[in-house]
């Protein structure tokens, strides 16, 4: 699963996820893309599950790009532990998602197949998405 090899700090503040995606909001590598239309956070497990669903559906033809990376650690305290006594341990990694962010891209497959694959992937994700096609200038 995806996670940083090393980080400057082990744990981060919770933070806020506001605004729209101002980078990574266009299809730049492939021809088709899966773009987020709602805000939320994707875990490393969700990103990997969606990637597997797409890869298996297109039977490993074409190319798939993952445009998001989980670089924010989420901590949890063990069950039945009283409040206080410091911040919990890092349990998993997430990627904060803003509306407009392109999550995945695909190339080398027909549009109908790409739509089906992205629909399977979207079912694995916790944000609402839409299918987009690269615009040619």
Curated annotation (Swiss-Prot):
Keyword Transmembrane helix: no
Record-level Gene Ontology MF annotations: rRNA binding; structural constituent of ribosome; tRNA binding
InterPro entries: Ribosomal_uL16 (IPR047873), Ribosomal_uL16_bact-type (IPR000114), Ribosomal_uL16_CS (IPR020798), Ribosomal_uL16_dom (IPR016180), Ribosomal_uL16_sf (IPR036920)
Stretches the record annotates as Disordered: 1-24
A Gene Ontology term for the protein's cellular component: cytosolic large ribosomal subunit
Pfam short name (any one): Ribosomal_L16
Ranges of biased composition (kind: Basic residues): 1-17
One GO BP annotation of this record: translation
KW Transcription (keyword) present: no
Keyword entries, A-Z: Ribonucleoprotein, Ribosomal protein, RNA-binding, rRNA-binding, tRNA-binding
Top-rank lineage group of the source organism: Bacteria
PROSITE patterns: RIBOSOMAL_L16_1, RIBOSOMAL_L16_2
Function of the protein: Binds 23S rRNA and is also seen to make contacts with the A and possibly P site tRNAs.
HAMAP family noted in UniProt: Ribosomal_uL16
Subunit structure: Part of the 50S ribosomal subunit.
PANTHER family: 50S/60S RIBOSOMAL PROTEIN L16 (PTHR12220), LARGE RIBOSOMAL SUBUNIT PROTEIN UL16M (PTHR12220:SF13)
Protein family (similarity comment): Belongs to the universal ribosomal protein uL16 family.
Protein name, as recorded: Large ribosomal subunit protein uL16
Lineage, uppermost ranks: Bacteria, Pseudomonadati, Pseudomonadota, Gammaproteobacteria, Aeromonadales
């Amino acid at each position: 699963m995806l996670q940083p090899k090393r980080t400057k700090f082990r744990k981060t503040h919770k933070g806020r996820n506001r605004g729209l995606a101002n980078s990574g909001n266009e299809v730049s590598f492939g021809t088709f893309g899966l773009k987020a239309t709602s805000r939320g956070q994707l875990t490393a497990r969700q990103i990997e599950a969606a990637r597997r669903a797409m890869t298996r559906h297109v039977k490993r033809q074409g190319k798939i790009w993952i445009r998001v990376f989980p670089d924010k650690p989420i901590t949890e305290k063990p069950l039945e532990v009283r409040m206080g006594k410091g911040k919990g341990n890092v349990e998993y990694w997430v990627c904060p998602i803003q509306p407009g962010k392109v999550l995945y891209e695909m190339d080398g497959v027909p549009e109908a197949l790409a739509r089906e694959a992205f629909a399977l992937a979207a079912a694995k994700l916790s944000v609402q998405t839409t299918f987009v096609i690269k615009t040619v200038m």
